[in-house]
């Protein structure tokens, strides 16, 4: 059954929500009275189509459909999920919620992208307050997984569980904020850092670039993979968090922050910040900065994925839901993926070593298909590659979608030979690989025949592929 989402407000955040749902196979209807909405959303979608597939080593679902609507009623009438991303004014949000609830289903989730309002404030005067909750994202929504899911005591339990399931299904991380508070959790941290930054600029201690450098070369990297408290736990050494608190606790009474003392944003201070920001980043367009941001995020999150940590572990979990069985097609489609930006080299194309990785991934998919999966390997059996011959026929570029078709050339006892073809979207051949593998006992580290069930599957595939040649 096709899943349907309505996006009310198609700015940077609404457009990001739209892209996240659309690229995960949802049909989308969007309402935004801005005459430039379609153009702005197309810019966000262009970035998302370039970036999101690069996070995964499995193909995303086929894109859903996208329709621009002229009324809220048209957008929400059959939606399973409704995301409100209108300006941060409570009167506007109340008016929009009233229009939404006049036409939407009672079991639909209504999420608000608000960064500051509490759900109880959003629900005031609502016909069905149990539908409404805060689902606060982070820009770019199509890449960053955190969603602060904030219900009130009036929000329905079933709506909360449905929201969690839907958000998880599209690769997001719903952080259930159990007690509502102004600005939720993350924005309270951001506000504290922002206020301190304003003072550092106003007092002439640091420029915008120096503040950003302090973050991106230092604690920002630690926070990306461990957060605040786990970082400080390490700072406590072997004695742990209690030692850290005992050591640094006295600092709380020292003049290290002006947290509650906020400088007035005068015209002079505003212009100073704007001028420094222009000097720092004005040589790049917003589109160039967005692409740089996205490429950096992809590389960082893929590194975290390799370690099974933080946002990387979430990508792996979502990727597992995307993996499809190979089926009976001959040859088998063993890989379908987008080329990540961190796989390219100084020539601007995929490094030759990554061709080998893609063919290795194709062999892994074959092994899973014949039953030589993780359990089989854990039981002490596997296949080792003894020889490969790769021919590089054309370039592969970052963001390009490629697929691999694999044919079994030989299945003879402990020996198996595969032939892989890597192809572009237009079916042009980019590279080929002939791969010879031996079955190995992982205890003795010597070759041996595979178990009977695996041997049977290998032989059947080899025969089917021979007959279709």
Feature names for model-found ranges:
Residues 1-54, 103:
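NAD(P)+-binding Rossmann beta1-loop-alpha1 motif at the extreme N-terminus of oxidoreductases
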Residues 2, 24, 172, 206-327:
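NAD(P)-dependent Rossmann-like dehydrogenase/reductase catalytic/cofactor-binding core
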Residues 16, 141-144, 150, 170, ...:
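Active-site-proximal catalytic alpha-helix in oxidoreductases
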Residues 33-36, 51-109, 117:
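Rossmann-like NAD(P)-binding element
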Residues 112-178, 183-187:
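Rossmann-fold dinucleotide-binding core
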Residues 326-386, 442-469:
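Hot-dog-fold acyl-thioester-processing enzymes
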Residues 366-416, 430-432, 438:
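Hydrophobic beta-strand-centered segment that forms part of the acyl-chain substrate-binding groove
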């Amino acid at each position: 059954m096709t899943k349907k989402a309505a996006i009310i407000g198609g700015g940077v955040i609404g457009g990001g929500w739209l892209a996240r749902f659309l690229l995960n196979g949802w049909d989308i209807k969007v309402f935004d009275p801005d005459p430039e909405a379609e153009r702005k959303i197309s810019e966000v979608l262009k970035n998302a189509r370039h970036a999101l597939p690069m996070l995964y080593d499995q193909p995303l679902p086929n894109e859903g459909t996208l329709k621009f609507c002229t009324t809220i009623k048209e957008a929400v009438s059959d939606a399973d999920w409704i995301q409100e991303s209108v300006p941060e004014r409570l009167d506007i949000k109340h008016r929009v919620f009233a229009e939404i609830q006049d036409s939407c289903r009672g079991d639909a989730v209504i999420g608000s992208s608000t960064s500051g309002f509490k759900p109880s404030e959003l629900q005031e005067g609502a016909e069905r307050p149990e539908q409404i909750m805060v689902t606060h994202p982070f820009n770019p929504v199509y890449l960053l997984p955190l969603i602060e899911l904030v219900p009130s005591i009036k929000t329905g339990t079933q709506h909360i569980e449905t929201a969690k399931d839907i958000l998880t299904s599209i690769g997001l991380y719903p952080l259930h904020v159990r007690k509502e508070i102004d600005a939720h959790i993350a924005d309270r941290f951001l506000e504290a850092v922002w206020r301190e930054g304003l003072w550092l600029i106003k007092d002439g201690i640091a420029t915008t670039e120096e503040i950003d450098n302090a973050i991106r070369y230092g604690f920002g990297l630690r926070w990306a993979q461990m957060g605040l408290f786990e970082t400080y736990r390490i700072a406590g050494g072997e004695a742990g968090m209690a030692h850290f608190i005992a050591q640094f606790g006295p600092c709380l009474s020292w003049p290290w922050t002006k947290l509650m003392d906020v400088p007035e944003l005068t015209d002079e201070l505003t212009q100073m910040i704007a001028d420094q920001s222009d000097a720092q980043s004005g040589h790049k367009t917003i589109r160039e900065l967005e692409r740089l941001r996205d490429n950096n995020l992809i590389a960082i999150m893929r590194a975290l994925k390799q370690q099974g940590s933080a946002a990387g572990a979430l990508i792996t979990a979502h990727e597992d839901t995307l993996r499809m069985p190979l089926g009976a097609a001959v040859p088998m489609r063993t890989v379908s993926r987008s080329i990540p930006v961190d796989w390219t080299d100084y020539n601007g194309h995929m490094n030759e070593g990554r061709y080998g990785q893609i063919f290795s991934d194709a062999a892994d998919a074959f092994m899973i298909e014949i039953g030589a999966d993780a359990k089989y390997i854990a039981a002490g059996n596997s296949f080792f590659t003894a020889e490969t011959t790769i021919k590089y026929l054309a370039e592969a570029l970052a963001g390009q979608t490629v697929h691999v078709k694999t044919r079994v050339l030989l299945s003879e006892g402990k020996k198996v030979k595969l032939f892989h073809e890597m192809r572009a979207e237009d079916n042009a051949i980019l590279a080929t690989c002939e791969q010879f593998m031996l079955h190995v006992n992982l205890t003795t580290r010597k070759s041996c025949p595979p178990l009977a069930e695996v041997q049977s599957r290998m032989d059947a595939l080899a025969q089917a592929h021979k007959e279709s040649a």
